[in-house]
Structure formats: structure tokens, C-alpha cells
Swiss-Prot record:
This is Cystic fibrosis transmembrane conductance regulator. GO terms for molecular function: ABC-type transporter activity; ATP binding; ATP hydrolysis activity; bicarbonate transmembrane transporter activity; chloride channel activity; chloride channel inhibitor activity; chloride transmembrane transporter activity; intracellularly ATP-gated chloride channel activity. The keyword Transmembrane applies. The chain crosses the membrane at residues 78-98, 123-146, 196-216, 223-243, 299-319, 340-358, 860-880, 920-940, 992-1012, 1015-1035, 1097-1117, 1132-1152. The modification Phosphoserine is found at S549, S660, S670, S686, S700, S712, S737, S769, S796, S814, S1446, S1458. Residues 1388-1482 are annotated as: Interaction with GORASP2. PANTHER family: ATP-BINDING CASSETTE SUB-FAMILY C, CYSTIC FIBROSIS TRANSMEMBRANE CONDUCTANCE REGULATOR. The lineage of its organism: Eukaryota, Metazoa, Chordata, Craniata, Vertebrata. N-glycosylated. Phosphorylated; cAMP treatment promotes phosphorylation and activates the channel. Dephosphorylation decreases the ATPase activity (in vitro). Phosphorylation at PKA sites activates the channel. Phosphorylation at PKC sites enhances the response to phosphorylation by PKA. Phosphorylated by AMPK; this inhibits channel activity.
Length: 1482
């Protein structure tokens, strides 16, 4: 990064933001890179800010029993906050003085007041100076407040992250990842965005007192009629806001539900295509979308009328304020114009600024209280260790994960108590759990000496992982003692990879030792894998190691644990994803040799590992079932195999034990996995599903969170808005809502109508887009816009013209913003934070995108034409009013008046043009109703356009080839369906209407001005050109800076979630300070982009303001110098001048809004234009004859046309099969050829990453394939792709359970009856499981079916294959992490239901070999062997070495029938002698 010019900038450069010119110039000429961003000053660095706030917070904790976070913030930021507030107040006060000067200028042209004509020029100079002063005061004040809000957010970000790394595991049980993300994004945005609004809570009352005093001087008591109307209006809009909140709550559940299904579809797109579920998923999502859009339209209409009511009120405020005075005393034109100006300012203060300020304080204090509660939660307590201790000793250890856990099931028991069990079971699945805490470990005692290997075994839920957590200090013992040195290294069961290089993941901040590093790489079998990467061990891995296979991730995690020099190594099932050969080699070379001198605790279920262990600990239901050597085990515990291998079914566990198992499972999800649990105390723990899911989901237990499948227990009837669970005293929606929903300040930066930097103010509001949850405040004010993400949110500075609200040109319709649905979708709910959504689209939206958007709906063009016609009618009405004005004025001059003798107070007199004004307003308002309703068809049609684009994009994604998904990131795809569709639904319709209307207003005003003073028109032309040039100049840079900021925002949340996933590993390695440093670097990188964007935006807004001031000076003096007698004309000229330029400023800002939002349309079009999967017809080699089918049609094979007859046998022939993940990529399979007979079972063998799963995907045509494949004589080129895939039954490695009922998960197309479903469920062992849930087949599974075990999920996949009636079954490592009971069920079903089917199995378990007749050995992307298992083992191959002697005996039981033959075979299979232990031990 470059040094910032701000460091050397002088006062004027800082005042006018001129120091940003270099980056603006560079961004205009070329594409900006991260290296072009300026370094941040020390005052903005995360280290500096967090240190100051942390010091004050520690001081607060030490000094008081009830510490207050707001006191710590006050000591850090108070005086700067006050200073900027005073400057802001002075800028706002100038608005009250402007109407006085305007009134004096108008009065000076009264024929009866020629004395003041000589000072008109000085009054004009004063009016212009007021605009200059306000510009110089407001822009620095607003920038300073947002800068300070950014600093507060940074400091709190750091404080929360540091606290997260210290939280105890018990607290983490109760906090989901979604809650932490929401705490950082939604809540902390309030500081970034709302700080400038906070001062209006005291500025507005002072302003109202001042304005009412001035109005009293003009109108006496009648002025309070206008104020009363404004108060009523504010209450009415608050009521409309409540209506919008109701629609929002109802809509939130549908949006959430749609995004959950969409996210699951994207994450499991390979399974969706393998099952041929594209149509089912499309229908499911479109049904949810239809319901969502009905509520979207209702919400848009209410927002539209809410904003229209605000503008409509302009006439009535003035009318009610003037009418009583006019009826009693009569009124002169000067007072009317002055009153109009005062009322505009007063209306803005009462109905906009004050409610927003109160709402901001309410939200900000609520956020501070949430953060304060979080910072006071229980911390992880480091155990006291004795560094001289060499042994590991545990004495009578008993521990609980959560002593109050049983309360969770109270309501489940109540809800299920009235359900009768037909099979006589003693209760439902959840009603069997104990209501008391169950210890996860009970009376555990053992001692391990230095250098010994302890193997820990046990069935599922026995407490194995909890034992390691106890040793690490993550689980506090309630009884007993633990002794060890404290120098621990840890390898978790679920591999954790941090973003960084392979070397960084292994070294993990420890000092680099070349010899040790190479030894570990070799022992963990990583040499060959690393050599295949172009950058070797400097290859950068994404979050979670997404580019690696499961086995590679597992080996890197193991290497990290071993590289650290520790006294005790804790290895939690490190071999789960490894093939037989690799597991054997790593266990021997790494665990037994390299670490021979170290104390090791290994969790395993392999008999070979137990035999080589020095000590064995078998846990059963949390208790010690056996402790000792293997030689003692068989004698003392003959039934050890059932306890070890888990043959005691989960369903047969005691109620207490099942409670403990589920506790541990959920806890593990919340810390190490992608999912998280939110346990809330007491009354929050309900098993009723939220009403948003509708009647068909009424039996569900859990509420789905959004994009990354978080889950939480939800309160009955409370919609999930953030996708996280809040406490009862912290509702998801505000209980106070003074501001209409669409205008609440939760995610606003000062909007265009809030901080009035422009000469005129008309309320307008833009809310944060759905996916702008990161620290992305947006400034737009004065005529400013603060934008967030791709959705620009306006600071809402509307013109504050004097006559603008009464004059036809100022009567704008709803400028209401799209509501902030970040709470609803929580997308950016969480996926965006994992993925850099780098765009390859131009910095400015192309004209082709606009044209395509307009023409995608046939009615849109006609609606736009209709709006134009209405505009022309209004302009005509305005010209008629001007004609009347000129006519009456002329008559006044020639005939004089005798109004003083008239008996009616409201007539045209020599001092009054009230009647003229009345006619003018009346004619203009003739078209008011038409003006209000003219926007509704446009908004309605644009929402319909959004519906069409969503449908087209969903279809394109479902039909896209897998090669597309191999190049796109899931988070980027999900962003299109969440963030961009939300923009199309909420922000874009009203923003486009704003832009169209504002442009028409400017054009109409110019026409009227030209009719009065052509000189002003000539002055307007260069200003319009300057505006357009400034916009083009700024837009090129601002869009690039926003993109860089968006990319810099991603690593912040990625780092947080990554840290949470690997929290146990971080603590075990003591790497918290290292990760805090990385987090601060991510914060600083984002701050650099965001601060520069704020500064350049302020540069643009100030230049726009200065251009306006120059224009207004010109208009003022042209009006004063060229106008004779007649105050009406000069009044109209000045008010129209302010109105034209403020509206033009607004239009320029609105055009930037539209350009930003249309980038979402560009991205959607990019997805719509994705290539689709080829139908792969047989291309005719000759020209088609008359009766032949068109070349575009698929000519189906005659065998396939016979229903249910193909495939009949399951014979497969593969010839020269080559597969690639992407077009032009390297071949991952080369020239594969083999054949499989009908009903034959074939096993796939090969090292991890050799291509076994790839081959199965190639069978389904999920890759780019070349070559020939036939099933029962039918080539895959001769039939539709969907029909080809339906020939296969699939049990994928990644289990796919989408949010829906059991019935939908088994049969999404609804083809089978309940009888058939129950029959298949019984056949695969699922019937007893499904019957335990309320609703049975109609029970709704959410969050990937997390309430089911992994084995149960596999059985659902197996049931799908049975229902598919497929003749060929593909199984991709179905036994990975399965308990033996489920595995035995799968084996049984394969023997029975698929007895006559062809089965292709990729498996690591030796037992699976017994079921296969032949094996396909894949090595280096090619088929190395295709033989029977007997031949593979007889040969001197690697697989012979991997299979133990006892397993080889299992493979050939018939060879043991006679002693002679057996001895001969045993001699042939003689074990190799073990190599000597190398001197490379750690």
C-alpha cells in the first residue's frame, strides 16, 4: 500500500478533501488494485483503537460491580462526538435564517416597499453566503461523525473477537456462529451508519423552538396548526411503519425458507443432479418465491404510500398554517413564500430527523447492551499445570457439558405426551431423555507414563472426545484431578484448515525446523501430494481447505499436531478419511516410529491399533469399561467387541446416555463444525416450530437458519429474522418503532433527507441492501449518498426549495428506500463472508444491460411511456398556471387594485396575490392523484421483472454443467439468490422510479424557467454538463473502491468463522495472539478501503454542492438585476432555482444509485447466460430428410422407449473414458476401459485422491467426459441426460438431506404411496427411527437433518436408491464415520434389495471386499488393475501389505477347510518382517 497524502495535507486540502484527487485520477484512468489503496493512519488502526477501548473496559470491570460499556466508549470518544455535534448544529441553524432573507428579497420588490429595493443585492449576497457556510460546516461534521463511528466499530470488532477466543466451551454451547456474525455485522453497523443521526435528538427540539418563534412572528397562533398536522403525520407514518413490520415479519420467514432450500441445493448440486431432482427443487423454490412475492408487493405498496404521504403533506402543512391567519387578517405573498420555506424545514425536523434520532439511540444502546452482555460471559479457564510432570494422570474424573441440559426436553415431553405409540415403546424419541444433567464422563481414572501410547475406544457417544477435551481444559471436571505438563498438541476428528499455505498450516506459527518439517511431511504421506501442486507447499489453501480431498485435509491436520514439540499428543480419530493402505503406513511410520518417545492418546476403533498400544481404555456410556493392556482385554472382557465397535444400538441406550450423546453431538457442531447450536435458558427452549413455515411444517422441531445451515432452538411464534436466536429480553424486531420500517435507522447512513447539506430537503431514504451486513455504512448526504455494497443507500438530502413542496415540480412520489432485509435474510446471511465475490463486470453498467432489463417484461416499456405522458400533462398544467400568473400580474399593474375596501379577506389586493397563488396551486394539484398512482404500475411491473429474472436464473443454475460449479464458489452463487434478488425486489424498483421522476422534474422545471427567464436556462446548461462530468469522473473510482471494500470485508468474517471452527486447536497450540494479529490485519485492510471510499464520496458531494452554490449565485443576481416590480416573479425564480439544482443533484446521486444497483442485474444476467448441460443428441452425419426429426431433438434408443425395461440387466461397458473437471483443464481420468457383467459387484481401490469418486461422477456425466459408455447396449450419446442418470441409484459420500419432511426427502416428486414408503423405510431400518418423531413421515427435517445420526442419513440415501428401482448402484464411501450397526444394515440391504443389481463400491473397510467379485485399482488417473481380490492379495502388491494376516484369512475362509491347504496358503502369505525403527523419532 502507498503512503496516504492525508499525512502531508494542509488545512484547506483536508477541508475540501482535495487530498483524494490522486486516487480519483488513477481510478478514472485505470483499474484500481489493492496496492493502490492508501495506508491507514495510526488513529484508524485496529491495534491502537482496540488497545484504548480494552484499557477503558478493563478499568470499568475493575472499578464497578455492574460495568457499563457505554462508559468505556464515552471516555474514548465523547469530546470528539460533542465537537462534531456543535459544528453540525451550526450548519443546521443556517436553514432557519435562509427563509428570512428570501422573504426580505421578495418584499423588496413589492411596489409599496421600494425603499428596500437598494438592499436586495446585499440580501442576495447574504443568502449565497449562507449556502457557502452551510457547505463548509456540514460536510466536515458529517465526515467526522462517520469517521468516529467507523473507529468505534473497529474497536468493538476487536474486543468481541478477543473475547470469542476466550469463551468457555460451556458458553459456546449457547452461542451459535450466526449470533456472533450478527453481533459483529447487524449491531455494530449502527455505529458506522447512525452516529451522525444521534445529535438530532437535541438539535431538532432547539430547531423547532427557533422555527416556531419565527413562524409566530409571521402568523401568530395559526402557525401551531401546521405543527399539529406534522405531529399527526408523524404518528400516521409510525402506524404505517408498524404495518410494514407485520408484512416484513411474515415475509422474512419465506425469504429465509427459500434461501435455506437454495443454499442446500447449491451445496449439494452434485447430489441434486445425480438424483435428477432439478425439477423438484425448482418447483419447491418457485412455490416459496411466489408466496414471498405476494408479501413483497404488499410491503412495497405500503412503503410507496408512506413516502407519498410525506410529500403530499407539504401542501397541507402550509395551507393549515396560512389559512387561519389569511381568513382573519389576510396575507401577503411574501409571508406565503417565507412560510413555505419554514414549513419545509420544520416538516423535515419533526417527521424525519427526530424519529430517526430517537430510533438510532434506541438501536445503538440496545447494541451496546448486547455487546456488554457478551463481553461479560464466562471465559475459558486455563488449568494449572506442572511442567516437571512427565506422566498423564486422571483420578476419579466426573464431568458435565451442561448441567441444565435436560431442561431442553421439557416441552418436547409435554408436546409428545398425548401421542400414542403403536409399537409399545416407552415414549417418543425425545421424551426418553432425562430431565436432569447426565455426566458425560463418570469416575474415569488412568495413568500413562512418558512415551506410552494409550488407545481410547468405545461406541458412539461413549465420551471419547470429551475425554480429550477434559485433558485440554475445555471441559471442567466436577470431581477428580488431572495431572500433566500442559505442553499439549491436538489433532481434531474433523480436519481444520486455516486460509493460508500448506506450510503455514503445518508450522502454525511455530519456529521453522527444516529437518523436523521434512520428517513430518514424510511420515504423514504428504510428499507425493505436495509434489503435485505447482507451488508445492507454498500452495494457498482456501477456507476449510476446499481444494483438498478429505484425506489430504486429515493428513495436514495430523502433520500440524505432530510438528509441534509437545509432551502429550491428543489424536481424535485422525484416520477417518484415509484409505486402508495410507492409514496403515501413517500409523506405523508416524504414530509408532516418529512419535515413539512421546506420550500419545489415540481415539480409534481399529483392532490393529489396539494391539500395538501400550494401554487401552474402553469407554461405555461415559464410564471406564476396561483399562489395561490388550493381552488382558480378551480374558477379562470377552464382550469387548460390542462395546468397542458400537454393536449396542443407539436406540437401546439408556435415557440418560442418549441425552449425554446428543449434548456432545450438538456441542461439537457448535464449535468445530459448520453448524452451531443456540441453547437458550428456560422458556426459550421450545420444540414448536416457528409459524413462518406454515401448516405443512408445523411438526418441525428446529428452525432453519440461512446460508450456512446454522440452527437454533426457537421460541414458539417468534419469526427468525437474523437466523439466530435472541434472548427474550432482546427481541428480533424492535419493540420501539418510531420510524416506519422502511426508514428505520438500523442500517442507514445519514440519508438524503436527514442531514441537510443541500439547499432544499425532501425526505428520501435508502436502506442497506440485503447483503451488506459487513461494516459497510454508506454515506450519502446532502445530496449525498452513502452506499453499501452494490446497493447505494442515500443519505437522503432532498432539495429544500422554498416553493418546491407546493410547486408541481417538487411533488415527488415515494422516495422510500427498499427496506433493510439484512435481518430477514441474514445472508449476507452468512455465506458471503466465506467468499470473495470478485466481479468481472465493468465499473459502470453497460447500456446493453439497461436495454435488456427494460425489454424483459412486455409491459414495462408501456408503463414508462405512460409515465412520460403524465409528465407532459403536468408540465402543460404548470405552463397554464404561469400564464395565469403573468395575466393577473399584468392586470394588477395596469388596473391597480382596491382590495383594501373589499369585504372578503382572501382576495387580490394591492399587497396580496393570494388568489393567484391559490389558482396556481389548484391547477398543479389537479394532477396530484394521478401523480401519486403513476408510480404504482411501474413498481408493480419492476417486481414482476425481478420474478422473471429469479426464475430464469434458477433454471440456468439447475441446468448448468458441473464444470461451472467447479469454477464458481457456492457463496458467490448464493449471493445472487439472496443479495442481488433482494436488491431487485426492494431497492431497484423505487430507485428507478426516483431517477425517472427526478429527471422529468428537472426537465419540466427547466421548461418553466425558460418561459420566465431564458438567461437562467443558459446558466443551467454548463452546470448540467459539470454535474454529468463529475458523476462520470467519480463513478469510475467509487465503484472500484466499493468492490475492493467488499473483497476486503470478506476476510474479516471468514477469519472469525475459521477461528470458531478451530477454536480447540487454537487453544491447544496457544495461537490466540497470532490469530488476533491476523484479525487486526484483516480489519486494517478493510478500513483502508472503506475510509478512502468515505473520503472520495465526501469529495464528490462537496464538489456537487459547490457547483450548486455557484449556480445559485448566478441565478440570484440574474433574478435581482432583471426583475422589476412584482414580488411573485422573483419569488418563483429563486425557489425554482434552488429546486432545479437540488433536484439535479439528487438526480445525479440517484443515477449513481441506479448504476450501483444495476450491477446486481448484470450479475444475474451473467448467471442466466451460463451454458447448460448438453442434451447430447446423436448428431446425424448426413443432411436430414423430410420426415426425419429435427437435429435439435434427442433421438432416443429403442430399448429406452420401452417403459421400465431399461436398464434390465445392469451391464456396463466403458471404453476410453477420459474426464476433466473443467473445459481445457487437465484430465483427472485417462483412457479408462473395463466392462461389468449384469449383477456383478465391483469395488474401487486406490489411495486418497486417486480418482475413485471422480470415476463415479463420470458415470453420471457430471464431468466433462470423452469416450464411450453403454448400459445394456444403450450408449449415453443416444438418450437424454436425465434418463441416463435415472439408470443409477446413488449413495454419495456427502449425504444430502434438504429442509423438508421425511416424505419429501424420500420421494420429492410424490410418486409413491405411504404404504410403499413405509415398506422401504422398514427394509432399510428407518421405520423405527421415523416413528419416533411427531408427524412421522410429515416431520420436517431442517439444518441438513442434524437431529439424525450420520448413519440414519445414509439410510435415507439408501432408501432413495431402493425407491428409484435402479439397476446400477453407486456407493461412494458409504461407511465413512458410520457406526457398525448402520454399516451392517447397509450391507444387509445391498444383499437383499440389490441382489440382482450391479453395484460399484468405493470403500475403505476391509469387510466391504467380501461382497465384491472384482476390484478396479485406480492409480495416477488410470486403471492399473481390474482383478479379483484373491489375485490382488496373492500378488506382491501394496494392497497385500495393507491387509493384515487375520483379514486375509477372512477373505479365504474356504481355504481353511484342511490343515494342509491352510498351512500352504499361510506360507504363501507370510508376514514381512518389520523394518527397524529409524532414528527420526520426535
Amino acid at each position: 500500500m502507498q503512503r496516504s497524502p492525508l499525512e502531508k495535507a494542509n488545512f484547506l486540502s483536508k477541508l475540501f478533501f482535495s487530498w483524494t484527487r490522486p486516487i480519483l485520477r488513477k481510478g478514472f484512468r485505470q483499474r484500481l488494485e489493492l496496492s493502490d489503496i492508501y495506508q491507514i493512519p495510526l488513529s484508524n488502526s485496529a491495534d491502537y483503537l482496540s488497545e484504548n477501548l480494552e484499557r477503558e473496559w478493563d478499568r470499568e470491570l475493575a472499578s464497578k460491580k455492574k460495568p457499563k460499556l457505554i462508559n468505556a466508549l464515552r471516555r474514548c470518544f465523547f469530546w470528539r462526538f460533542v465537537f462534531h455535534g456543535i459544528i453540525l448544529y451550526l450548519g443546521e441553524v443556517t436553514k432557519a435564517v435562509q427563509p428570512l432573507l428570501l422573504g426580505r428579497i421578495i418584499a423588496s420588490y413589492d411596489p409599496d416597499n421600494k425603499v428596500e429595493r437598494s438592499i436586495a443585492i446585499y440580501l442576495g449576497i447574504g443568502l449565497c453566503l449562507l449556502f457557502i457556510v452551510r457547505t463548509l460546516l456540514l460536510h466536515p461534521a458529517i465526515f467526522g461523525l462517520h469517521h468516529m463511528g467507523m473507529q468505534m466499530r473497529i474497536a468493538l470488532f476487536s474486543l468481541i473477537y478477543k473475547k470469542t477466543l476466550k469463551l468457555s466451551s460451556r458458553v459456546l454451547d449457547k452461542i451459535s456462529t450466526g449470533q456472533l456474525i450478527s453481533l459483529l455485522s447487524n449491531n455494530l453497523n449502527k455505529f458506522d451508519e447512525g452516529l451522525a443521526l444521534a445529535h438530532f435528538v437535541w438539535i431538532v427540539p432547539l430547531q423547532v423552538v427557533l422555527l416556531m418563534g419565527l413562524l409566530w412572528d409571521l402568523l401568530q397562533a395559526s402557525a401551531f396548526c401546521g405543527l399539529a398536522f406534522l405531529i399527526v403525520l408523524a404518528l400516521f407514518q409510525a402506524w404505517l411503519g408498524q404495518m410494514m413490520m407485520k408484512y416484513r415479519e411474515r415475509r422474512a420467514g419465506k425469504i429465509n425458507e427459500r434461501l435455506v432450500i437454495t443454499s442446500e441445493m447449491i451445496d449439494n448440486i452434485q447430489s441434486v443432479k445425480a438424483y435428477c431432482w432439478e425439477e423438484a427443487m425448482e418447483k419447491m423454490i418457485e412455490n416459496l418465491r411466489e408466496t414471498e412475492l405476494k408479501l413483497t408487493r404488499k410491503t412495497a405498496y405500503v412503503r410507496y404510500f408512506n413516502s407519498s404521504a410525506f410529500f403530499f403533506s407539504g401542501f397541507f402543512v402550509v395551507f393549515l398554517a396560512v389559512l387561519p391567519y389569511a381568513l382573519i387578517k389576510g396575507i401577503i405573498l411574501r409571508k406565503i413564500f417565507t412560510t413555505i420555506s419554514f414549513c419545509i424545514v420544520l416538516r423535515m425536523a419533526v417527521t424525519r430527523q427526530f424519529p430517526w434520532a430517537v430510533q438510532t439511540w434506541y438501536d445503538s444502546l440496545g447494541a451496546i447492551n448486547k455487546i456488554q452482555d457478551f463481553l461479560q460471559k464466562e471465559e475459558y479457564k486455563t488449568l494449572e499445570y506442572n511442567l516437571t510432570t512427565t506422566d498423564v494422570v486422571m483420578e476419579n474424573i466426573t464431568a458435565f457439558w451442561d448441567e441444565g441440559f435436560g431442561e431442553l426436553f421439557v416441552k418436547a415431553k409435554q408436546n409428545n405426551s398425548d401421542v400414542k405409540m403403536s409399537n409399545g415403546d416407552n415414549g417418543l424419541f425425545f421424551s426418553n431423555f432425562s430431565l436432569l444433567g447426565t455426566p458425560v464422563l463418570k469416575n474415569i481414572s488412568f495413568k500413562i507414563e512418558k512415551g506410552q501410547l494409550l488407545a481410547v475406544a468405545g461406541s458412539t457417544g461413549a465420551g471419547k472426545t470429551s475425554l480429550l477435551m477434559m485433558i485440554m481444559g475445555e471441559l471442567e471436571p466436577s470431581e477428580g484431578k488431572i495431572k500433566h505438563s500442559g505442553r499439549i498438541s491436538f489433532c481434531s476428528q474433523f480436519s481444520w484448515i486455516m486460509p493460508g499455505t500448506i506450510k503455514e498450516n503445518i508450522i502454525f506459527g511455530v519456529s521453522y525446523d527444516e529437518y523436523r518439517y521434512r520428517s513430518v511431511i514424510k511420515a504423514c504421506q504428504l510428499e507425493e501430494d505436495i509434489s503435485k501442486f505447482a507451488e508445492k507447499d507454498n500452495t494457498v489453501l482456501g477456507e476449510g481447505g476446499i481444494t483438498l480431498s478429505g484425506g489430504q485435509r486429515a493428513r495436514i491436520s495430523l502433520a500440524r499436531a505432530i510438528y509441534k514439540d509437545a509432551d502429550l499428543y491428543l489424536l481424535d480419530s485422525p484416520f477417518g478419511y484415509l484409505d486402508v493402505l495410507t492409514e496403515k503406513e501413517i500409523f506405523e511410520s508416524c504414530v509408532c516410529k516418529l512419535m515413539a518417545n512421546k506420550t500419545r492418546i489415540l481415539i480409534t476403533s481399529k483392532m490393529e491399533h489396539l494391539k500395538k498400544a501400550d494401554k487401552i481404555l474402553i469407554l461405555h456410556e461415559g464410564s471406564c469399561y476396561f483399562y489395561g493392556a490388550f493381552s488382558e482385554l480378551q480374558n477379562l472382557r470377552p464382550d469387548f467387541s460390542s462395546k468397542l465397535m458400537g454393536y449396542d444400538s443407539f436406540d437401546q441406550f439408556s435415557a440418560e446416555r442418549r441425552s449425554s450423546i446428543l449434548t456432545e453431538t450438538l456441542r461439537r457442531f457448535s464449535i468445530e463444525g459448520d453448524t452451531a447450536v443456540s441453547w437458550n435458558e428456560g422458556k426459550k427452549q421450545s420444540f414448536k416450530q416457528t409459524g413462518d413455515f406454515g401448516e405443512r411444517r408445523k411438526n418441525s422441531i428446529l428452525n432453519p437458519l440461512n446460508s450456512i445451515r446454522k440452527f437454533s432452538v426457537v421460541q414458539k411464534g417468534q419469526p427468525q429474522m437474523n437466523g439466530i436466536e435472541e434472548n427474550d429480553d432482546e427481541p428480533l424486531e424492535r419493540r420501539l418503532s418510531l420510524v416506519p420500517d422502511s426508514e428505520q435507522g438500523e442500517a442507514i447512513l445519514p440519508r438524503s433527507n436527514i442531514i441537510n447539506t443541500g439547499p432544499t430537503f425532501q425526505g428520501r431514504n435508502r436502506r442497506q441492501s440485503v447483503l451488506n451486513l459487513m461494516t459497510r455504512p454508506s454515506i450519502s448526504q446532502g445530496q449525498n449518498m452513502f452506499k453499501t455494497g452494490n446497493a447505494a443507500r442515500k443519505m437522503s438530502m432532498a432539495p429544500q426549495s422554498k416553493l418546491s413542496e407546493i410547486d408541481i415540480y417538487s411533488r415527488r412520489l415515494s422516495q422510500d428506500s427498499g427496506m433493510d432485509i439484512s435481518d430477514e435474510i441474514n445472508e449476507e446471511d452468512l455465506k458471503e463472508w466465506f467468499f470473495d465475490d470478485v466481479e468481472n463486470i465493468p465499473a459502470v453498467t453497460t447500456w446493453n444491460t439497461y436495454l435488456r432489463y427494460i425489454t424483459i417484461h412486455k409491459n414495462l416499456v408501456f408503463v414508462l411511456i405512460w409515465c412520460l405522458v403524465i409528465f407532459l400533462v403536468e408540465v402543460a398544467a404548470s405552463l397554464v398556471g404561469l400564464w395565469l400568473l403573468e395575466d393577473i400580474s399584468f392586470k394588477d399593474k395596469t388596473n391597480g387594485t382596491n382590495g383594501a375596501n373589499n369585504t372578503f379577506p382572501v382576495i387580490i389586493t394591492d399587497t396580496s396575490k393570494y388568489y393567484l397563488f391559490y389558482i396556481y396551486v389548484g391547477i398543479a394539484d389537479t394532477f396530484f392523484a394521478l401523480g401519486i398512482f403513476r408510480g404504482l404500475p411501474l413498481v408493480h411491473t419492476l417486481i414482476s421483472v425481478s420474478k422473471i429474472l429469479h426464475h430464469k436464473m434458477l433454471y440456468s443454475v439447475l441446468k448448468a454443467p458441473m464444470s461451472t460449479f467447479n469454477t464458481l464458489k457456492p457463496g458467490g452463487i448464493l449471493n445472487r439468490f439472496s443479495k442481488d434478488i433482494a436488491i431487485l425486489d426492494d431497492l431497484l424498483p423505487l430507485t428507478i422510479f426516483d431517477f425517472i421522476q427526478l429527471i422529468l422534474i428537472v426537465v419540466g422545471a427547466l421548461i418553466v424557467v425558460s418561459a420566465i427567464r431564458p438567461y437562467i436556462f443558459l446558466a443551467t446548461v454548463p452546470v448540467i454538463i459539470a454535474f454529468i462530468m463529475l458523476r462520470a469522473y467519480f463513478l469510475q473510482t467509487s465503484q472500484q473502491l466499493k468492490q475492493l471494500e467488499s473483497e476486503a470485508r470478506t476476510p474479516i468474517f471468514t477469519h472469525l468463522v475459521t477461528s470458531l471452527k478451530g477454536l480447540w486447536t487454537l487453544r491447544a497450540f496457544g495461537r490466540q495472539p497470532y490469530f488476533e494479529t491476523l484479525f487486526h490485519k484483516a480489519l486494517n485492510l478493510h478500513t483502508a478501503s472503506w475510509f478512502l471510499y468515505l473520503s472520495t464520496l465526501r469529495w464528490f458531494q462537496m464538489r456537487i454542492e459547490l457547483v450548486f452554490v455557484i449556480f445559485f449565485i448566478a441565478v440570484t443576481f440574474i433574478s435581482i438585476l432583471t426583475t422589476g416590480d412584482g414580488e411573485g416573479r422573483v419569488g418563483i425564480l429563486l425557489t425554482l432555482a434552488m429546486n432545479i439544482m437540488s433536484t439535479l443533484q439528487w438526480a445525479v446521486n440517484s443515477s449513481i444509485d441506479v448504476d450501483s444497483l444495476m450491477r446486481s442485474v448484470s450479475r444475474v444476467f451473467k448467471f442466466i447466460d451460463m451454458p447448460t448441460e448438453e442434451p447430447l443428441p446423436a448428431k446425424p452425419t448426413k443432411s436430414l430428410k423430410k420426415n426425419q426429426l429435427s437435429q435439435v431433438l434427442i433421438i432416443e434408443n429403442e430399448h429406452v422407449n420401452k417403459e421400465n425395461n431399461w436398464p434390465s440387466g445392469g451391464q456396463m461397458i466403458v471404453k476410453d473414458l477420459t474426464a476433466k473437471y473443467t473445459d481445457g483443464g487437465n484430465a483427472v481420468l485417462e483412457n479408462i476401459s473395463f466392462s461389468i457383467s449384469p449383477g456383478q459387484r465391483v469395488g474401487l481401490l486406490g489411495r486418497t485422491g486417486s480418482g475413485k469418486s471422480t470415476l463415479l461422477a463420470a458415470f453420471l456425466r457430471l464431468l466433462n467426459t470423452e469416450g464411450e459408455m453403454q448400459i445394456d447396449g444403450v450408449s449415453w450419446d443416444s438418450i437424454p441426460l436425465q434418463k441416463w442418470r435415472k439408470a443409477f441409484g446413488v449413495i454419495p459420500q456427502k449425504v444430502f438431506i434438504f429442509s423438508g419432511t421425511f416424505r419429501k426427502n424420500l420421494d420429492p416428486y410424490g410418486q409413491w404411496s405411504d404404504h410403499e414408503l413405509w415398506k422401504v423405510a422398514d427394509e432399510v431400518g428407518l421405520k423405527s427411527v421415523i416413528e419416533q418423531f411427531p408427524g412421522k413421515l410429515d416431520f420436517v427435517l431442517v439444518d441438513g437433518g442434524y437431529v439424525l445420526s450420520h448413519g440414519h442419513k445414509q439410510l435415507i440415501c439408501l432408501a432413495r436408491s431402493v425407491l428409484s428401482k435402479a439397476k446400477i448402484l453407486l456407493l461412494d464411501e458409504p461407511s465413512a464415520h458410520l457406526d457398525p450397526i448402520t454399516y451392517q444394515i447397509i450391507r444387509r440391504v445391498l444383499k437383499n434389495a440389490f441382489a440382482n443389481c450391479t453395484v460399484i463400491l468405493s470403500e475403505h473397510r476391509i469387510e466391504a471386499m467380501l461382497e465384491c467379485q472384482r476390484f478396479l485399482v485406480i492409480e495416477d488417473n488410470k486403471v492399473r488393475q481390474y482383478e479379483s481380490i484373491q489375485k490382488l492379495v496373492n500378488e506382491k502388491s501394496l494392497y497385500r501389505q495393507a491387509i493384515s494376516h487375520s483379514d486375509r484369512m477372512k477373505l479365504f475362509p474356504h481355504r481353511n477347510s484342511s490343515r494342509h491347504k491352510s498351512l500352504a496358503k499361510i506360507t504363501a502369505l507370510k508376514e514381512e518382517t518389520e523394518e527397524e525403527v529409524q532414528e527420526t523419532r520426535l
